[in-house]
Amino acid sequence: MEAIINKLYEQQSLTQEESQQLFDIIIRGELDPILMASALTALKIKGETPDEIAGAAKALLANANPFPRPDYDFADIVGTGGDGHNTINISTTAAFVAAACGLKVAKHGNRSVSSKSGSSDLLDSFGINLAMSAEDTRKAVDDIGVAFLFAPQYHGGVRHAMPVRQTMKTRTIFNILGPLINPARPNIELMGVYSEELVRPIAETMLQMGMKRAAVVHGSGLDEVAIHGTTTVAEIKDGKITEYTLTPEDFGLESHPLEAIKGGDPEENKAIITNILTGKGTDAQLGAVAVNVALLMRLFGHEDLKANTQQAIEAMNSGKAYQLVQQLAAHA
């Protein structure tokens, strides 16, 4: 371990195997906190490579509690959080809409990073059981088409890094690992990142982790596909990465200002999301969710973004998406 940490002190990048060894020891609680802080700082200052991120993610997945993985195509739709904009819970809402459009979604989530209400806070308010067993969660994906895996239930080892992360008060590699360590191991993923600089490296990381089809996005300051500006995309298909940009017009929608999709506390968000999922939200709110669902649908082979967007809006207007919230709450 000394050799690995010394390599970081010399600003040398680790191999994927070395990174996996380092994070394996961190997750097992076997690395001295001072050394852990040094290693995380050295990685941050050097800039984490796709190899290092993939190695860390593999270590966390190897140490995670097991989940009975479906053998069909299924996805995660998730953002890193930490974009600082406190928007409504777009990816959580989009998960229900995507399921209403016939996709299978197993969403990995945690308490909030930057918004006043993270995905788990919102789900809690709808009466959805976050402590659902892995078997029940899997059954929900099978039967309802959507379920949520609450990170602390599967990744207990992350607690060993918590005191160091809280003391450091800065972003570390852990801030980007969450979306990469879904214990259900989806083969399709739409992942939003808080910085445009991360789009390509995270796509390269996903490629190394064997993702079948995925897109990494940053939307004009947001860790989502944007309704207020352009979105930078790195898409994985057939083992290759293609980079492109999207605008609201590509989805057949007008753009709306960022203020139009601001969120609130969990209770306010619950009211907003209920309106969206029953088609009573504003055009901006429905559009913000629909563009994310539309890109996720593309990853399942439905290439026409405009048609996908209309299908997503219809799933909200019909109330079908909200019915899935009620079914998931009853499932527990």
Curated annotation (Swiss-Prot):
Entries under PANTHER family matching the protein: ANTHRANILATE PHOSPHORIBOSYLTRANSFERASE
For this record, the Gene Ontology CC terms, alphabetical, are: cytosol
- What is the superkingdom listed in this entry's lineage? Bacteria
SUPFAM superfamilies reported for this sequence: Nucleoside phosphorylase/phosphoribosyltransferase catalytic domain, Nucleoside phosphorylase/phosphoribosyltransferase N-terminal domain
Q: Which InterPro entries match?
A: Anthranilate_Pribosyl_Tfrase, Glycosyl_Trfase_fam3, Glycosyl_Trfase_fam3_N_dom, Glycosyl_Trfase_fam3_N_dom_sf, Nuc_phospho_transferase
Q: How does it assemble?
A: Homodimer.
Write down the Gene3D superfamilies for this protein, in alphabetical order: Nucleoside phosphorylase/phosphoribosyltransferase catalytic domain, Transferase, Pyrimidine Nucleoside Phosphorylase, Chain C
Please list the reactions this protein catalyses.
N-(5-phospho-beta-D-ribosyl)anthranilate + diphosphate = 5-phospho-alpha-D-ribose 1-diphosphate + anthranilate
Q: How is the cofactor bound?
A: Binds 2 magnesium ions per monomer.
One GO molecular-function entry:
magnesium ion binding
UniProt gene name: trpD
What HAMAP family does the database record attribute to this sequence?
Answer: TrpD
Report the function annotation for this chain.
Catalyzes the transfer of the phosphoribosyl group of 5-phosphorylribose-1-pyrophosphate (PRPP) to anthranilate to yield N-(5'-phosphoribosyl)-anthranilate (PRA).
| Positions with a binding annotation for Mg(2+) 2 | 223-224
Where along the chain is anthranilate 2 bound? 165
The EC number on file is: 2.4.2.18
Instruction: Name its species.
Output: Vibrio parahaemolyticus serotype O3:K6 (strain RIMD 2210633)
Give the pathway listed in the UniProt entry for this protein. Amino-acid biosynthesis; L-tryptophan biosynthesis; L-tryptophan from chorismate: step 2/5
Q: What is this protein called?
A: Anthranilate phosphoribosyltransferase
State the similarity comment: Belongs to the anthranilate phosphoribosyltransferase family.
EC top class, as a word: transferase
> Could you tell me the keywords of this UniProt record?
Amino-acid biosynthesis, Aromatic amino acid biosynthesis, Glycosyltransferase, Magnesium, Metal-binding, Transferase, Tryptophan biosynthesis
Write out the residues that bind anthranilate 1: 79, 110
Binding residues annotated for Mg(2+) 1, in chain numbering: 91, 224
Gene Ontology annotations of biological process type: L-tryptophan biosynthetic process
Residues that hold 5-phospho-alpha-D-ribose 1-diphosphate according to the record: 79, 82-83, 87, 89-92, 107-115, 119
